[in-house]
Structure formats: structure tokens, C-alpha cells
Regions:
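N-terminal presequence-like segments and the immediate start of the first folded domain
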Residues: 1-72, 76-89, 95-141
Length: 141
């Protein structure tokens, strides 16, 4: 019995790529070698999302719009995995200017309801292109 339990616990969990159709083609497609989300053992790991408008491929100049786009893009990955913002357990926010923190928080609060996920916000020197914010999410039903 013990050998069977050990063998079962060593089995690799199936890892599934989550790629929303909106990410696959068009101006919003990055062509970068990464997967927007990985689902394994019921936990979704959302890769860093920026505020690129998926219709134009551009990042808005208005910061609140950039934050909304960033969260909407992350939301597409959550939805493609059958999850939503209410399933988020951890969020990492990267900002190129910590002075933008209060403005980010105002938009962020409209997406995440109580109990809100654990969150870390980090100031960074640079993000891809003109992005001022990048967000990663870990979610689980």
C-alpha cells in the first residue's frame, strides 16, 4: 500500500496553457515566447499583463485607462480558465512610478472585492515599451 501511495504522489500534474483567443492574433498579439496563463492542479498562474489595448496594440497615455486595460487583459486569462477576479488569491503589481500608486489603487478596488487577494506592489525602473504598470495574478477556485 505504501509503494502505491508514493507512486501516486510522484505523478506529474497536467499543466495546461491558457491563451485567450484575443491574445492569439491581431494588434494585441505580442509574438513573445510566453504563455498568458498556466493552469496546474486547479491553480492558475497569470503571466505579467500590461495595459496594451488588444484592438490597437497601443498602451493608453491616460494612466487609469492603462490600469483598466491591464486588469481587463488579466481578466481575459482568468475567464479563459473558467475563473474570475473573485478567485484571485495573490496579485503582484509593478509600477514604474510609485507616485501612481493611489491612482492604481482606485481602479484596482473596482475589480477586486472583499476578501481581496494578498498583494505586493513593487516600484521598478522600467517595463516593456511604454508600460507603467504590469500585473501578475495567481487564482484558484
Amino acid at each position: 500500500m505504501l509503494c502505491c501511495s508514493l507512486a501516486a504522489s510522484n505523478a506529474r500534474a497536467e499543466k495546461r496553457a491558457i491563451v485567450p483567443k484575443e491574445f492569439a492574433t491581431g494588434p494585441g498579439a505580442t509574438g513573445l515566447p510566453y504563455t498568458p496563463g498556466i493552469l496546474i492542479d486547479g491553480t492558475l498562474y497569470v503571466a505579467g499583463q500590461v495595459g496594451r489595448d488588444l484592438k490597437t496594440g497601443q498602451i493608453p497615455t491616460e494612466f487609469e485607462s492603462e490600469v483598466r486595460n491591464t486588469l481587463d487583459n488579466a481578466g481575459l486569462v482568468l475567464k479563459a480558465a473558467g475563473l474570475g477576479f473573485e478567485d484571485a488569491v495573490a496579485v503582484q503589481v509593478y509600477l514604474t512610478d510609485m507616485e501612481l500608486f493611489p491612482r492604481m489603487n482606485t481602479v484596482y478596488a473596482t475589480y477586486f472585492k472583499d476578501p481581496r487577494p494578498a498583494r505586493t506592489t513593487v516600484g521598478v525602473a522600467k517595463l516593456v515599451g511604454t508600460a507603467r504598470i504590469e500585473i501578475t495574478i495567481t487564482a484558484r477556485k
